[in-house]
């Protein structure tokens, strides 16, 4: 199974035993130089490196094409390469994931290919040492920040919500709540209590949650002021960057203390740090109840940032993706509270079903656009940090080429299915296979850049 992976042991540090992450103790490893490639001399020079995180399965194959055919022929950039493919994560005891996050902290920009988060079946398939955690979760825990998902709009791809004529960016607070909760099943009558024991030695506080007359379920969850504050800063900075209004949705009428804390921290930070900039850009910030917000989103035309708690963001981001047409047309960017560190990736997974077909030697029609946008969003941000207008223009041109290619009628099967219905589409009449579609984008990009 690991045969599809390139040998990259020289690029990633191997670790003989599992290691615990401690920021003060770990340093970013040194990398050998990438092998020299022979490209045209008139490439855009990028002064500072970009961290590249490779991935798994079909997206890994597409990722290589994007890098070698669309990016590097036009951009002279040093890539700090990390192989986050599952076999290498297993070989390094997941140290490679930690190292990639620390490198992102150092260089401020990372682009990431989709990766496998193993379950029991994957542990058996890859003969893993253990069921490794989600690499995205590991990276987010080190970097902090907020995951922003935004649709890529193509005029000819029908939207389930036709009124959404402008993008809606959803900012998910990817920390705590249900995803770090302790939940349990009780099988008899008893009392469920929550206890908080202060570190300063003062008296413990106790809350009685429920007296169970019989079996049931319970849960305790948390979040922190520090994490909520980082979430708020990321959202306000992103809104200013996009020049779009920001809405925070909670259910503070029910969770008066828990969700109320989100509402209060956002308002305090807005008033203290961002109100002037929002007024200058003629945008606004509002808190809305989640049920009211969902209704308003459906009635809106788009053009705003929606800040969601962890679970809400998980659910609503998929609703937005389908509402705009396809998960294959959805970008995902992790923005850190410092306002300069980001990690860009596709919002979808590794496309396992297509990879199984690829293993059998059969052609697939896999949509690469979200993976291309991972590169463009990362490079555009690198350009903004470095003041490199040529790099910014290149990234924006490649994005426009992708959209214009689809709007011209050249697309993959998933997008053709949105127009004609999957049961009605035919190869080369309604859609192209993966390679032909990527070749079409390459030709259109070369033409747009005046390379032909």
Swiss-Prot record:
Transit peptide limits: 1-39
Broad class of the protein's primary localization: mitochondrion
UniProt PTM comment: Acetylation at Lys-413 dramatically reduces catalytic activity. Deacetylated by SIRT3.
Pfam families assigned to the protein according to its UniProt record, in alphabetical order: Iso_dh
Catalytic activity: D-threo-isocitrate + NADP(+) = 2-oxoglutarate + CO2 + NADPH
Known tissue expression: Predominantly expressed in heart, liver and kidney. Expressed in activated B lymphocytes.
GO CC field: cytosol; mitochondrial inner membrane; mitochondrion; peroxisome
Role: Plays a role in intermediary metabolism and energy production. It may tightly associate or interact with the pyruvate dehydrogenase complex.
Protein name, entry field: Isocitrate dehydrogenase [NADP], mitochondrial
Species of the source: Mus musculus
Origin organism lineage: Eukaryota, Metazoa, Chordata, Craniata, Vertebrata
Gene name linked to the record: Idh2
